[in-house]
Every structure is written in C-alpha cells, then in structure tokens.
C-alpha cells in the first residue's frame, strides 16, 4: 500500500513539471519551485565559471588531478598511459 502511494505521488510530481521532456533530458525528475527553470546552457556556463583550482581539484578528486597533470606532461611513459586509461575507465564506470 505504501509503495503504491509513494509511486503515485512521484508519478504525479513528475507529470506536474511544466516541461517534461526537458526534465527527462536533464535528469531532473522533480519540478523546480521557480517558474522559469534554468536551461542546460545556463547551468553549464555557471559550472564552467566556477571551476575549481588545481589544488581544490586534487583535494576533492585525486585521481582526476593526477590525470590532468599527466596529460600536461610532454612525454608519457607506457605506465603513465595505462594509468590514464585506468582512471578514465573508473570515471566512466562510476559517473554514469
């Protein structure tokens, strides 16, 4: 009974969104409280403008910071290449 009530509520919330196809594309399943939701371009610009410094990035995501420093190097050893590939596989596995 609880499951059906919760699922009906979530479905109603999902349908109450003004632009349902935008919500599906952006993975925004719950409606916003604003009348004019921010579109994907505005969100990506905000994210790009608030990019982290290398120090903050290395503190938050050490494997990404390592990849960035390795990519900036002029010559990479085979071990460095394999490390970059492993990190990209890790990102792909856990980001999606």
Swiss-Prot record:
Its main location: secreted. It is found in: Secreted. Keywords: Secreted, Signal. It comes from the Eukaryota. The keyword Signal applies. Transmembrane segments: none annotated. Residues 45-84 are annotated as: Disordered. One of its GO terms (cellular component) is extracellular region. Expressed by the venom gland. Residues 1-25 form the signal peptide. Belongs to the non-disulfide-bridged peptide (NDBP) superfamily. This is Venom protein 3.1. It comes from Lychas mucronatus (Chinese swimming scorpion). The lineage of its organism: Eukaryota, Metazoa, Ecdysozoa, Arthropoda, Chelicerata.
């Amino acid at each position: 009974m609880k499951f059906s009530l919760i699922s009906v509520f979530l479905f109603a919330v999902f349908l109450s969104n003004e632009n349902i196809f935008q919500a599906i594309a952006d993975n925004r399943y719950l409606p916003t409280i604003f009348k004019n939701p921010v579109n994907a371009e505005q969100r990506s610009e905000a994210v790009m403008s608030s990019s982290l410094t290398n120090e903050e990035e290395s503190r938050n995501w050490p494997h990404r910071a390592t990849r960035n420093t390795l990519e900036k190097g002029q010559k990479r050893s085979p071990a460095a290449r394999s490390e970059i590939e492993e990190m990209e596989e890790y990102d792909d596995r856990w980001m999606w």
